[in-house]
Amino acid sequence: KEQGFETIGVIRGDELRDKISENPTLSFAQECGMRFEFVTREAYRHKTETAFIEQLQVKFGSFYLVPEGGTNDLAVKGCEEILTEFDAHFDFVCSAVGTGGTISGLINSALPHQKVLGFPALKGDFLQNEIHKFVNNKNWELITDYHFGGYGKVTTEFIEWMNWFYAQTGIPLDPIY
């Protein structure tokens, strides 16, 4: 909204069409001027296929497609700028992982002595292949034991640990990631 970008959100689950006000993320996006295209869960499975994208182009005209999670070559390149010379003394760089873009940028820009550890918010082994699309380095590892059953799921113990960690370090952590 501030930059004048016209945005269209392709939303999985056409049942959400009448529940925008109940969803803080959709409400905020709508307040910022985003238009929505609600699609069935079945249709959403085809979101990266040419025919699906062409249907969107017919309806909305020319657009730049930001993939789910935001991961693409430009995102990875941008995330390569996260680490700076001030981070050179760290041996480990840890990051939450959603779709792999941020950690890919960190892997590409980490120094030879640094190991990048990623903690996926999603269950499943698909992220290894996604990350390999963007990196050649071997300086990384995914720690896959902390997804708590899937995206956005947490346990009481995890929240307690996050609070303890914040009290010890002053670093806030995101419970979703």
Task: Name each model-derived stretch.
Residues 1-177:
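PLP-dependent amino-acid enzyme catalytic core
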